[in-house]
Structures are given as structure tokens and as C-alpha cells.
């Protein structure tokens, strides 16, 4: 906001700060998500090194060993399931401390990644969609995608309007998969495959380049997701979108 800059090291700290503004949120502030080091400018790097934030990790012997082993040992999948069952989305790591225990980092910080990884990778039982597919569908509704558009162009729209933080190459692939209608692909393809979207013989891997193929909403989507229901939907807010 103007010359003011506030840094947050996790979503929990940011959400707590955002809630201090009430229902309207932090008006006037520009919110920027830093995906990796490449997001930072040269001036920001100079500031990072001028104000180094160094946190020491504390090792607690067997307790730390067991916690680390539980997360990375392939044979302890059942223990990880119990760990994820106890997930609290409101718990987060206090980054103001100069030292943290390995257990604290894993149970209050890494667990957010592991839970989100499951949400991204496993279709939801309610609608059968993963997060990326739901963002694609949301963007299609927002754009009123009733006429065809190039897959490559649509992926750019999705990335801009749904706070998609991952590569557009994977987003292109998700859109292509969402439109495939050969036997063994989708029970119902929510997008139309206007072009060569791959074949059963190659498992869809022979789809043409996203620059050459087009898509649009399948008319059946209006029956599955009636627009009259949208006012009842609970929308997720991400990056102020």
C-alpha cells in the first residue's frame, strides 16, 4: 500500500492480519503471492540480505527422529493418515521466533503442504473434481465460455482469474484431459474437444498442441451445475480473488 510493505511467511499470519480489516478485507493493499525466488526483484533481494531472517532448527533426539521418520518413511503410510486426520487449518507456525523444533515445523507448517497436496491430487467425493479442475470450471463460468477458444488462451485466462500458482503447461494438460471423451477418459467431459484431444490408443498423450486445439463448455454442464445454485455456493478467496 503506497510505500508500505508487509511480509508474511505463511497463510495463517496473512489471514490473521486480513481479518483485522473486517469483512471488506485490506482495501487499498496490493496482495502478491511469491511462488519462488524468481518472483523477487533485485531490489527485494538486496532488502532480504540486508535484513536476514535466520531461524535455527532444534533437534530433540528420538522425538525428532520419530517425527521425521513418520513423514518420509514409505512404510508408515498409516501413521501419516492419522497425522493428516488431526489437521487444523487454523494452526500455523509462529515465524517471529528465532528457533523452532523439527516437530513444530512438521506438525504446524509442513502439514499444510501435505494436506493441500492431497486436495490437489485426489478428486473430491462431492463433485469428482480436483482443485485445478474446479478452477478451470469456475473460470469457464466466469468467462461464459459458450463459444470456442484456444486451449492455450483459456489456460492464460484461468491462471489470471483463479489464482492458479502452478505451471501453465500442467494447466494446459488439465484442460485437455477435462475435454477428452474417448472410452476410458471421462464419464462426462465438462469441456468440448474441438480438435485432436488424443486417442484411447495412446491414453490421450497424442493430443495436439494447446495452440492448435479449441474448447468450450459442454452444454450438459448447465444441467450438472445450474447457475441458480451459484448464490448458494461457498467461494474460496485466494490472493484477494
Language-model features, listed with the residues they occupy:
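Conserved phosphate-chemistry cores used by DNA topoisomerases
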Residues: 1-241
